[in-house]
């Protein structure tokens, strides 16, 4: 089993839960690891660097695969909010290794009258090693032979978001 994948399984749910409670909001985060570092990318800044547009599925697939290659990442985690048909809100976390291992977790969260997150279920025992919550995770670690113009765009985008990517040494 990949060290970075196991590290993300062990640490990412609690780190992300703490971030949600600190900021009182569920923001999409993409985290990726090599064998020594964990990197956090908060996608909320994408409208500022992407012509007013957020990060759609196609851009997420391209950019995550670009980052995986650039950082030699061996595992990627993704967390964001989802809402069920019955309006139950939950955080969906997916972790995928370059070898295709998947781990997924759902945690219910509650908000107050101002839509600020007040609580996130701390029970991390309900996980699944089978199917990701967000199917886009299945596109991570796919080889993409980027055309020159797409690669130039991704390099430019990377230079703009690079200062915002947080780097954390893996805990021993």
What are these regions (language model features)?
Residues 1-58:
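N-terminal domain-onset segments
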Residues 60-172:
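Low-complexity intrinsically disordered segments
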